[in-house]
């Protein structure tokens, strides 16, 4: 039975509590590997599928990521859109010093994880004077379009994350896992699961995606607000 992205996060928690007893790094999922490297400072140098996101906005990782995932030609625009949106989110909101992206192909799906060590979603919104109940509430508000982006004196509605989730869960029959601070939110087409992660908080923000890309996905069908 296929492990979900939520199962992968729970596996990370087990590994972390076992003092990083890792035997085969190449078998780690993107969710686990990016967390261990960026969140916990573990060196996993033999992972060829991981790429750095540099604060200076170097974008060479994108082509390398896409090439390694072997995305079908008719769905390359899906991955291009998602990578562009999530990369921009990191640059515009996180104030990060270290970021990573990792993709991995499985027989029936593709997994991609983005992580940064920035200020996390709740702190980003608090810095903009938004009222936040907790870290899960902050994640949901960000998904629903609450944004800290301000240009020419106007606060913009943030649609990139919302569109990305809509494409993944409805267009690609996939799922999304977002961990930020002490909040964890797992989304599928039919369900939203949330929990507080006091013992294993994410120092910045993790966004993991699982996508089924065997059939062509028309991203323009999903560029509409997805209200959670």
Model segments located where?
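ATPase catalytic-site recognition across NTP-hydrolyzing enzymes
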Residues: 137-140
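Conserved ATP-binding N-box helix of the HATPase_c
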Residues: 12, 73-106, 162-165, 170
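Short beta-strand element(s) in the Bergerat
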Residues: 108-112, 205
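A short glycine-centered beta->alpha linker in the GHKL/HATPase_c
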Residues: 120-131, 135
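Amphipathic alpha-helical interaction surfaces in cytosolic regulatory modules
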Residues: 1-43
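Flexible, glycine-/charge-rich segments associated with ATP-binding catalytic modules
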Residues: 1-14, 44, 48-52, 129-133, ...
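Intrinsically disordered, low-complexity linker/loop segments enriched in Gly/Pro
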Residues: 51-74
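Acidic ATP/Mg2+-coordinating residue in the GHKL
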Residues: 116
């Amino acid at each position: 039975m296929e492990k979900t992205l939520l199962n992968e996060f729970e596996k990370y928690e087990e590994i972390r509590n076992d003092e990083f007893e890792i035997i085969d790094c190449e078998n780690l999922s993107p969710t686990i590997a990016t967390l261990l490297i960026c969140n916990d400072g573990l060196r996993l140098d033999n992972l060829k599928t991981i790429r750095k996101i540099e604060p200076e906005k170097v974008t060479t990782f994108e082509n390398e990521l896409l090439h390694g995932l072997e995305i079908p030609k008719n769905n390359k625009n899906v991955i291009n859109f998602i990578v562009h949106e999530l990369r921009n989110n990191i640059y515009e909101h996180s104030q990060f010093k270290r970021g990573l992206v990792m993709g991995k192909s499985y027989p029936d799906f593709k997994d991609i994880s983005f992580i940064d060590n920035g200020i996390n979603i709740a702190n980003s919104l608090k810095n903009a004077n938004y009222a936040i109940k907790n870290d899960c509430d902050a994640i949901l508000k960000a998904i629903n379009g609450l944004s800290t982006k301000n240009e020419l004196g106007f606060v913009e509605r943030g649609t990139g994350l919302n569109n990305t989730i809509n494409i993944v869960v409805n267009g690609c029959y996939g799922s999304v896992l977002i961990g930020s601070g002490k909040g964890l939110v797992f989304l599928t087409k039919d369900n939203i699961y949330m929990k507080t992660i006091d013992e294993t908080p994410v120092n910045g923000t993790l966004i993991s995606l699982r996508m089924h890309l065997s059939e062509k996905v028309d991203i323009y069908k999903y560029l509409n607000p997805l209200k959670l």
